[in-house]
Amino acid sequence: MSNFSIISDYKPAGDQPKAIDEIIKGLNNKKRSQMLLGITGSGKTFTMANIIERTNRPTLIMAHNKTLAAQIYSEMKSIFPKNAVEYFVSYYDYYQPEAYIPKTDVFIEKDSSINEQIDLMRHSATRSLLERRDVIVVSSVSCIYGLGSPDLYYQMTVNLEPGKSYPRDKLLNDLVNLQYERNDIGFERGCFRVKGDNVDVFPSHYSDKAWRLSFFGNELEYIHEFDPLTGEKLVKLDKAIIYGNSHFVMPKETVNKAISEIEEELQKRIAFLKSQDKLLETQRINQRTQYDLEMLTETGSCKGVENYSRFFTGRKAGEPPPTLFEYLPKDALLFVDESHVSVPQIRAMYNGDRARKEVLVEHGFRLPSALDNRPLKFEEWDNFRPQTVFVSATPSLFELNETGGEVVELIIRPTGLLDPECIIKPATNQVEDLVGEIQSTIAKGFCVLVTTLTKKMAEDLTNYLQELKYKTSYLHSNIHTLERIEILRDLRQGTIDILVGINLLREGLDIPECGLVAILDADKEGFLRSEVSLIQTIGRAARNSEGRVILYADKMTKSIDKAISETMRRRTIQQEHNEKYGIIPKTINRTIHALAELEKVDSKLDKKQTHNLFENPAKLKAHIDKLRKEMLKAASNLEFEQAAKLRDQLKTLEEAALELS
């Protein structure tokens, strides 16, 4: 059994050793929930990594969005290069769920675009969980959505060992049942091909490796891992386990049993709708379901097969669907990052999904069993989760109630940096005062972050500062991902001195060059000026040894009072620690990983082409598909050097797209 092994030049420092010991002590004492209160720059990810290494338990880390999940995944991948660090998020680049609008009698068909790279990584994650223990899966909250049953998924695997006999026709049939496609010309992920005594399989969890099964009659002589592009043999394998090309693969008997149960439910639903004199709905549900049943009978699958998942998994009506949590071992560990945001998201997901599907069921577009194709209810998630460590700088009531108010604090930073000094100034004439503060901050070589309450005010302030010849940019939700990354890069490199935003200057925005955070209209109580929002925004100045925060307010609100009191409490603890050990705070100039990814793409494509590609997901996906076809064509023409060059470019784009998604 492999153990977790951290590869890093750093050792736990500051509050990290104490926090690691306390969390591990709680885990050993069977505490179900613990709270790790980690402030900005305290090294929460490195602390989590050390807890994982010392407990040596399979781990799931949940983040509240794909971007944060990608950041954590990249960091964990670099900390644990010898272990299985996996990424599990929604594989849709674009997703429009099916819906019906009764008021206008409009039915919207399901429309989606699947990201092949993320689909591959999802398969890699479930495979790792089933085959090994040194696994870290970094996931978004979408992991609470239904997934194929782990029992069926594993039951459907094809296990191969050299020296054993496998009737070739049966093997090929098994591959088809696993939803692999025979393609003797275009060999890509999820395909197999037959050449003489060889069967080549491109597993669902690989992008650059395939397996060659060499037979003598029905006896499997060798299994070679090879490069599907060049045909070069890489290594000989002692065994191979082929997993399904979908998490919803099912044995024929299960499909037949499900068909029978779907027909039974259909007849009950038809009888009910007729009793309500809903003739249109009766005709609609009969026509749609009969078509799905025909497809299931002929192919073992159908469009929207997930809506019948209850029958395939053997669950009863109302029971929770199988999710990623059922793939976890019983002794797994769960970290919920930025839990003050993640937990409310988990709580909200079920109700939104339910409301849409109830309309579909009521109007004859789906059977009632479709309601069981859903995310977990919050109570179900709470019941399923293993021993959990919530991680946040601003824990909410749920986490504090779960831990009995006990908190393990990460307040002292390894760098010795203090929480920023907070100054309150009158909101009257706040813009004029801000201009003076901006001037003095820029003179020191630092940049400025300004947060406003409304989009209109942010736009007006940006225009005003630009008229005064300040290099200013505006960060808002309509900006494409690449442009956002470019703005942050320009800010850090000094091309921009001031960044104005509304609610985008909070979690995950780490800019060591920031010398001032200005919060306009700080006394306007509400979501954007709550205690949590203020503490998170104040934290943006905590990566600079000279960082300051100015709150413009005409009155002291409860949120301001609590936020400043908490910041000063932390600052006092940090100052005392620094004085005791003679530590001098020093700004750490840390590169933003996503910027490095962007530069990798820039090095292979010109800036104009890069910007055009990342303007929208459709352009990027089309270009990646085009590159893949060119690569395969070059390989088939035996132009291996050109094919390898295209493969490198393709891999770079896919990795960057993942970071920037």
UniProtKB/Swiss-Prot annotation:
Q: What is the lineage of its organism?
A: Bacteria, Pseudomonadati, Pseudomonadota, Alphaproteobacteria, Rickettsiales
Q: Which domain of life is it from?
A: Bacteria
* Originating organism: Rickettsia bellii (strain RML369-C)
Q: Name one GO biological process term.
A: nucleotide-excision repair
Residues bound to ATP are 38-45
What InterPro entries does this protein's entry cite?
Helicase/UvrB_N, Helicase_ATP-bd, Helicase_C-like, P-loop_NTPase, UVR_dom, UVR_dom_sf, UvrB, UvrB_inter
Q: Where is the Helicase C-terminal domain?
A: 430-592
Describe the location of the Helicase ATP-binding domain by residue ranges: 25-182
Main location per the UniProt record: cytoplasm
Entry coiled-coil feature ranges: none
Short sequence motif Beta-hairpin: positions: 91-114
The Swiss-Prot or TrEMBL record describes its family as follows: Belongs to the UvrB family.
Question: Mind telling me what this protein is named?
Answer: UvrABC system protein B
Assembly with partners or alone: Forms a heterotetramer with UvrA during the search for lesions. Interacts with UvrC in an incision complex.
GO cellular component terms given for this protein: cytoplasm; excinuclease repair complex
The answer on whether this UniProt entry bears the keyword Cytoplasm reads: yes
Compartments in which it is found: Cytoplasm
Free-text note regarding domains: The beta-hairpin motif is involved in DNA binding.
Q: What does this protein do?
A: The UvrABC repair system catalyzes the recognition and processing of DNA lesions. A damage recognition complex composed of 2 UvrA and 2 UvrB subunits scans DNA for abnormalities. Upon binding of the UvrA(2)B(2) complex to a putative damaged site, the DNA wraps around one UvrB monomer. DNA wrap is dependent on ATP binding by UvrB and probably causes local melting of the DNA helix, facilitating insertion of UvrB beta-hairpin between the DNA strands. Then UvrB probes one DNA strand for the presence of a lesion.
- UniProt keyword list: ATP-binding, Cytoplasm, DNA damage, DNA excision, DNA repair, Excision nuclease, Helicase, Hydrolase, Nucleotide-binding, SOS response
**One MF term in GO for this entry?**
DNA binding
